[in-house]
C-alpha cells in the first residue's frame, strides 16, 4: 500500500490523470475478480462512508453501500429531507461536521457548485455520486465495461444520442483524457453548451445534427433518459423534441458490427431506446450496472489507501 499524501476528491472526471485512470481500471478488474471468487478483502476495515442524497437513486446507493461493506467498512445514509442539510444548515458547516465523523463522503445532489463548496470545507475525500453537470462514477463504470468487453478504448468512437446532460459532459472530459472520439447528437435547443466544453477537448468532440450519421462506425452507442431528475416540467416538450433521437436497431446497424449499447438506467423502452436494442445482444446494460460496484470500490480504496 502506498497511502495518499494529501486529501484528494473526485468531483469531475478531469480530476484524475490518464495514469490514475489506468491504475483504477486495472484495480477495478482485480477487485471484481476478488468479488467473483468470494475472496475477502478488507482494506477499509472500520472506515465509514457518509452517503448524502438530495436526489434519490437505486444503483448509486446500493453500489456504494455494498461496496464499502465488501471492503470492510460501513455506510451511513443521510437524506437531506431528514437532516439539518434539508433545514437550511450551511453547506460549509455540514462539511466540517460530517467530515470529522466519517472517513469518506459521497454526495448525490443537484448543482455542481454544492459539491464543490462541500469539498472545499471537508477534511476527508468527497466523491460525486451525481450532479446536474457531471456523473463521473457512471462514465468510469461504462469505460471499464467497454474495456472488459472490447479492449482499450483509446482511438475508438463513442456515440451519444440524446440530451446534453451530466453524462454527455462527463463523456466529453473522458474523451480528452483517454483519447477517443466522442460523437454527439441532440435536437436543437438541447445541444452541448460551449462554456462546458474545454478548448482542449474540442478535437475529440464531433457534433452531428443527424443521429443516424452520429452512429456511423461507432464502437459504443449510449444514451440516457430524455428528462433528467429536476426537469420533469419539461417532460412533454422533451418527448416531442427528441422523437427522432430514440436509439433504434437502424442506428445500431450504422455502428460497427460488434458495437455495444449502454444506458445508465433507469430506461424507458419506446422513448430513448427501442426495446429490441436494450434487450438485444449488443446491450451490456446489466454488466454496466454491476460495474458501478467494482469501479467505486477501486475509487474508495484509492482515495483512502492509495495504491496497492
UniProtKB/Swiss-Prot annotation:
The lineage of its organism: Bacteria, Pseudomonadati, Pseudomonadota, Betaproteobacteria, Burkholderiales. Carbamoyl phosphate binds at residues 57-60, 84, 108, 135-138, 264-265, 292. Keywords: Arginine metabolism, Cytoplasm, Transferase. It catalyses: carbamoyl phosphate + L-ornithine = L-citrulline + phosphate + H(+). Pathway: Amino-acid degradation; L-arginine degradation via ADI pathway; carbamoyl phosphate from L-arginine: step 2/2. L-ornithine binds at residues 166, 224, 228-229. PROSITE patterns: CARBAMOYLTRANSFERASE. Belongs to the aspartate/ornithine carbamoyltransferase superfamily. OTCase family. GO terms for molecular function: amino acid binding; ornithine carbamoyltransferase activity. Gene3D superfamilies: Aspartate/ornithine carbamoyltransferase. NCBIfam families: orni_carb_tr (TIGR00658), PRK00779.1 (NF001986). GO terms for cellular component: cytoplasm. Reversibly catalyzes the transfer of the carbamoyl group from carbamoyl phosphate (CP) to the N(epsilon) atom of ornithine (ORN) to produce L-citrulline. HAMAP family: OTCase. Its EC number is 2.1.3.3. One of its GO terms (biological process) is citrulline biosynthetic process. This is Ornithine carbamoyltransferase. The gene is arcB. It comes from Ralstonia pickettii (strain 12J). It is an enzyme of class 2 (transferase). It is found in: Cytoplasm.
Amino acid at each position: 500500500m502506498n497511502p495518499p499524501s494529501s486529501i484528494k476528491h473526485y468531483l469531475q472526471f478531469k480530476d484524475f490523470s490518464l495514469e490514475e485512470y489506468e491504475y483504477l481500471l486495472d484495480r477495478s478488474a482485480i477487485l471484481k475478480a476478488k468479488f467473483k471468487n468470494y475472496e475477502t478483502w478488507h482494506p477499509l476495515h472500520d472506515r465509514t462512508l457518509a452517503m448524502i442524497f438530495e436526489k434519490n437513486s437505486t444503483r448509486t446507493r446500493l453500489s456504494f453501500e455494498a461496496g464499502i461493506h465488501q471492503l470492510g467498512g460501513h455506510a451511513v445514509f443521510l437524506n437531506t429531507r431528514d437532516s439539518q442539510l434539508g433545514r437550511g444548515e450551511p453547506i460549509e458547516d455540514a462539511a466540517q461536521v460530517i467530515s470529522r465523523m466519517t472517513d469518506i463522503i459521497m454526495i448525490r445532489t443537484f448543482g455542481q457548485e454544492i459539491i464543490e463548496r462541500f469539498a472545499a470545507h471537508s477534511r476527508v475525500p468527497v466523491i460525486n455520486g451525481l450532479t446536474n453537470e457531471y456523473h463521473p462514477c457512471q462514465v468510469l463504470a461504462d469505460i471499464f465495461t467497454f474495456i472488459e468487453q472490447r479492449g482499450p478504448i483509446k482511438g475508438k468512437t463513442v456515440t451519444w444520442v440524446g440530451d446534453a446532460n451530466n453524462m454527455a459532459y462527463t463523456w466529453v472530459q473522458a474523451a480528452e483524457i483517454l483519447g477517443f472520439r466522442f460523437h454527439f447528437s441532440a435536437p436543437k435547443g438541447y445541444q452541448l453548451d460551449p462554456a462546458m466544453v474545454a478548448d482542449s477537448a474540442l478535437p475529440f468532440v464531433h457534433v452531428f445534427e443527424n443521429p443516424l450519421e452520429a452512429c456511423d462506425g461507432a464502437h459504443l452507442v449510449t444514451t440516457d433518459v430524455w428528462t433528467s431528475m429536476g426537469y420533469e416540467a419539461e417532460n412533454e416538450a422533451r418527448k416531442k423534441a427528441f422523437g427522432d433521437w430514440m436509439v433504434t436497431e437502424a442506428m445500431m446497424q450504422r455502428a460497427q458490427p460488434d458495437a455495444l449499447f449502454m444506458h445508465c438506467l433507469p430506461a424507458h423502452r419506446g422513448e430513448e431506446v427501442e426495446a429490441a436494442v436494450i434487450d438485444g445482444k449488443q446491450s451490456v446494460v446489466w454488466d454496466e450496472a454491476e460495474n458501478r460496484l467494482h469501479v467505486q470500490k477501486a475509487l474508495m480504496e484509492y482515495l483512502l489507501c492509495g495504491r496497492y
